[in-house]
């Protein structure tokens, strides 16, 4: 069973926490290098891939309402990650499953998300047949602020454990319903288990219409970018990646939507090394595949960043 402690540690976004200084100071250059760990035994390509160069900004000082102002995070170095004996894909378990819960509007393109996740993790990703919310028998409530229905994440995670197929590395439920991890929390965007290979996240609050705001002309691109972030963030947790405190990184925790929007789509050197250690992918080919996807999706800034990483990792950059 996923406890509240686990929910605090691994939730993608939680809202309702009161801003309070936890005395967090961003790690300095030496601490960031120690988090990456020694790379002298790696290939030249991997040494360049995990180098802390200027394409990876360090973690900024959190604002009063940001995640690290409200939650104590000690960080997870690459060495600590290795010692934790995280879940790793093997010859049998190499498929990531996405389980839709409830109805999805046409603009929520699940095939695009499936394709993106396949490029990001360099693994096969399959979308399962959608099921209704009622079929799961999940605990629900009406949020006192939004007056919208919410589903208890712990119930979904328990239900998903029975859905792990023999070839499944993990299974992630995706829904348009709002979520909450326990009665005292306002809501949560997503939650995943670091050890049990199950997770859930919601698209609901990524659409400006949820808050009664007008949808801009590029709102579909905005929703796609947000959905890509939470999908890969939560799946990253199922690989054993904890929240990142070292660089501006996809795996940073976030306490509100604006903070989530500030997070990049990419992994920092520490977290990239963790994922590459687990999945064993070719870093350059992965960057190339992600850049092509982003170009086709109209995410031009992200595509340019990825192409710059291709050059630097190959050794042809300045």
Task: Say what each PLM segment does.
Residues 99-103, 204, 254-256:
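Short strand-loop junctions, especially beta-strand C-caps/beta-turns
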Residues 1-6:
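Positively charged n-region of N-terminal signal peptides that target proteins for export
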Residues 7-17:
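Bacterial N-terminal signal peptides
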Residues 107-109, 182-183, 212, 262, ...:
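Generic domain-boundary/flexible-linker signal
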Residues 165-232, 238:
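Active-site-proximal segment of zinc-dependent metalloprotease catalytic domains
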Residues 19-164, 168-170, 174, 284-318:
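N-terminal low-structure segments adjacent to metalloprotease catalytic domains
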Residues 152, 202-204, 268:
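Helix N-cap / beta->alpha transition motif
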């Amino acid at each position: 069973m996923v406890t509240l402690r686990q929910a605090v540690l691994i939730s993608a976004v939680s809202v309702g926490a009161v801003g309070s200084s936890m005395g967090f100071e961003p790690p300095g250059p030496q601490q960031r290098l120690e988090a990456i760990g020694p790379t002298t035994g790696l290939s030249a390509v991997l040494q360049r891939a995990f180098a802390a160069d200027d394409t990876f900004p360090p973690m900024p000082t959190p604002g009063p309402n940001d995640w690290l102002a409200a939650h104590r995070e000690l960080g997870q170095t690459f060495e600590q990650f290795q010692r934790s004996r995280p879940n790793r894909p093997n010859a049998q378990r190499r498929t990531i499953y996405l389980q839709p819960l409830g109805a999805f509007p046409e603009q929520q393109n699940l095939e695009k998300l499936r394709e993106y996740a396949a490029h990001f993790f360099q693994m096969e990703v399959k979308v399962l047949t959608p099921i209704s919310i009622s079929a799961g028998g999940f605990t629900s409530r009406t949020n006192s602020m939004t007056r919208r229905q919410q589903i208890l994440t712990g119930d979904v995670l328990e239900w998903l454990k029975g859905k792990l197929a023999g070839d499944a590395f993990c299974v992630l439920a995706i829904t348009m319903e709002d979520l909450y991890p326990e009665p005292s929390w306002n809501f949560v965007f997503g939650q995943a288990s670091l050890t049990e290979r199950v997770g859930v996240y919601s698209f609901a609050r990524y659409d400006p219409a949820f808050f009664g705001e007008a949808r801009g002309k590029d709102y579909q691109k905005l929703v796609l970018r947000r959905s890509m972030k939470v999908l890969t963030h939560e799946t990253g947790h199922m690989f054993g990646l904890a929240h990142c405190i070292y660089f501006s990184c996809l795996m940073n925790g976030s306490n509100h939507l604006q903070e989530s929007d500030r997070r990049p789509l990419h992994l920092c050197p520490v977290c990239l090394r963790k994922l590459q250690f687990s999945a064993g992918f070719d870093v350059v080919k992965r960057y190339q595949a992600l850049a092509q996807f982003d170009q086709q999706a109209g995410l031009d800034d992200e595509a340019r960043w990825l192409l710059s990483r291709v050059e630097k990792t190959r050794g042809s950059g300045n």
